[in-house]
Amino acid sequence: MFLRRLSIQWKITLLAGLCLLGVVALLVGLSVYRMQHSSVLVKSASTQMLDESARLRLEARGELQALRIQRYFMDAFQYGKGFSRQILFLRDQAQKRFLDAYDLREDLTRQVRTALAANPEVLGLYVVFEPNALDGKDELFVDQPALGSNDKGRFSLYWAQATPGQLESESMIESELADTSSGPSGAAYNAWYTCPKESGQPCVLDPYFDKVGERQLLMTSIAFPLELDGKVIGVMGLDINLSNLQALSEQGNRELYDGVGQVGILSPAGLFAGNSRDAGLLGKNLAKADPQHAGELLQLLAAGKSRLFNENDDLKVLQPLQPIPGAKPWGVLLEVPKSALLGPALALERQLDDMRREGTWVELGLGLGAAVLGLLVLWLSARGVTRPILGVAHMLRDIASGEGDLTQRLPHTGRDELGELAGWFNRFLDKLQPIIRDVKVSVRDARSTADQSAAISSQTSAGMQQQFREIDQVATASHEMTATAQDVARSAAQAADAARGADQATRDGLALIDRTTQSIDSLAANLTSAMGQVEQLASSSEEIGSVLEVIRAIAEQTNLLALNAAIEAARAGDAGRGFAVVADEVRNLARRTQDSVEQIRGVIEGLQQGTRDVVDAMHGSHRQAQGSVEQVDEAVAALQRIGEAVTVINDMNLQIASAAEEQSSVAEEINRNVAAIRDVTESLSSQAEESAQVSQSLNRLANHQQGLMEQFKA
């Protein structure tokens, strides 16, 4: 519908423009799609590459942190290994030189102290020999801690260094050496001694807190077996402070993406020796910090395998390390948010998105410019094509606006489609001009005949309408009279029915009142009987009260007799003790009987009061029942009078209904006759109106046709 209103020029421009816009949109869309697809591929490849690089970097950081920790342990290991060889050398030299046992123990004590003082980073050094394994003379040095001997004379020296330069020594008693109670890691308390002794290899203990001086420090022990001819004769160990490991974890976290992650150091049992995020977890199990992955991490740690985990928004790396040769693996646990780890990849993605959006807008602008330029060229081309058609249209408009002048002709000089159109249009006018001339003469004759027919039809229609209005008034009056007669008959019949219903209701009311009277009489008789029974119950309650009074008196007398018996039994001494017990029981029974009598008395008094209330209520009900009987008798008399009046009304309604029915039948007959006459008159009036309308329409058409013909100039 919209295209029909457009000119040919605009139709050509619109359709060709839509095709051009479709092609431009397709090309731009395809280009944008390819660019976006390429951007996605580039982002995916670059993100994957940067992600892999970040993972490798994180693993490298884990290895670097593991090497730092391993170097820290290896420094202590090398120191302890050298000192253990020195102790064995001192023992060997003492035997070769036949050095006195006292001097040997004194020399060992001095050497341990000197070694500890020379290494302030070590918290303590200890040397423990098997019984009589040092010099075979333990029994000579019982309870001599100054020479490193314990309560059995066994050499078990421990030097502690709470602060650098402040050294204290003690000898470890046998109960400490034999203490196998479990520590936080699950290992025995004396694992520092039993582990190297039983394995024959150096051991690193799990982290534990111990009091050094006045401070609670997290520490671990590296213990070395003292072997002679393949047999372990003692243990030498050193305690190292693990606060340095906490410092290493914090330093590693600062170096790892500006401290946004976490570095943890784990022992073989899963205890934290360092935690950069929460120092409160030191010495505690991994299960408290990460219960979900603790089991898997500890299994990997025990197997010495590294692993990289993806967990929600974080990336975790477990890097195992061997603190000393032959020891169980420890581990470094690195945790970094993916947002920090993949920061370069995300920045590259944002840069690619910006470039893609910029390219999209450039392509859209170029496409839109090309489309506008193409539409302009199409519009100019369509204008050149439609200009001759507009010339022919202007000529036809001049002919149409020149009062239907059929004498004009279109000039045509060309031999194209437009010239052929003008030639055939001129030939059409040559045939139409004489026909229009003859039609104009015929129209003038038809108009005069139509004027005469319209005048006659108007007069006939007016007369029929006057007759129809008068008959319609008669029919309306007859119909109203019939309706009134029918209403009177219906009202009389309804009144008769209502009177019969009232009469029946009166009879039903009398029967109901009669039954009610009988029920009230029966109720009054029952109340009279019940009153006698309740009064008898009240008298029985009073008799029960007198019986209870007798029981109470007997109970009091029994109580007095039991009291006298108890007094006599007391006078009789041991001979009357049994009788005193019986008298006491009798007195208790008498007191309980007396209490029960008082309770029963209270119940009986309540029952008597209730009985008196019931008697009063029943007297009132009896009086109300007698009053109700008198009111019912009065209602019966009133209903009988109503019934007599309803009977008279019913007879009169029947006579009125009969007369109204006869009047209604006569009125209906008259109404039918008048309605038939009205219908015939209405039909004639309608036909007369239709005839007048046809004549008027014919007259209007003749006038219109003459007006149309007058527009043509033939």
UniProtKB/Swiss-Prot annotation:
Residues 50-290 form the Cache domain. Keywords: Cell membrane, Chemotaxis, Membrane, Methylation, Transducer, Transmembrane, Transmembrane helix. One of its GO terms (cellular component) is plasma membrane. Histamine binds at E170, Y208, F209, D210, D239. The keyword DNA repair does not apply. CDD domains: HAMP, MCP_signal, PDC1_MCP_like. Coiled coil: none annotated. Pfam families: HAMP, MCP-like_PDC_1, MCPsignal. InterPro entries: HAMP_dom, MCPsignal_dom. Disruption phenotype: The pctABC-tlpQ deletion mutant is devoid of histamine chemotaxis over the entire concentration range (50 nM to 50 mM). Deletion of the gene significantly reduces chemotaxis to AI-2. It is found in: Cell membrane. Residues 383-437 form the HAMP domain. Residues 442-678 form the Methyl-accepting transducer domain. It is a multi-pass membrane protein. The chain crosses the membrane at residues 12-32, 360-380. GO terms for biological process: chemotaxis; signal transduction. Homotetramer. Belongs to the methyl-accepting chemotaxis (MCP) protein family. Chemotactic-signal transducers respond to changes in the concentration of attractants and repellents in the environment, transduce a signal from the outside to the inside of the cell, and facilitate sensory adaptation through the variation of the level of methylation. TlpQ is a chemoreceptor that binds and mediates chemotaxis to histamine, a key biological signaling molecule. It binds histamine with high affinity, which permits responses to very low histamine concentrations. This is Methyl-accepting chemotaxis protein TlpQ. It comes from Pseudomonas aeruginosa (strain ATCC 15692 / DSM 22644 / CIP 104116 / JCM 14847 / LMG 12228 / 1C / PRS 101 / PAO1). The lineage of its organism: Bacteria, Pseudomonadati, Pseudomonadota, Gammaproteobacteria, Pseudomonadales.
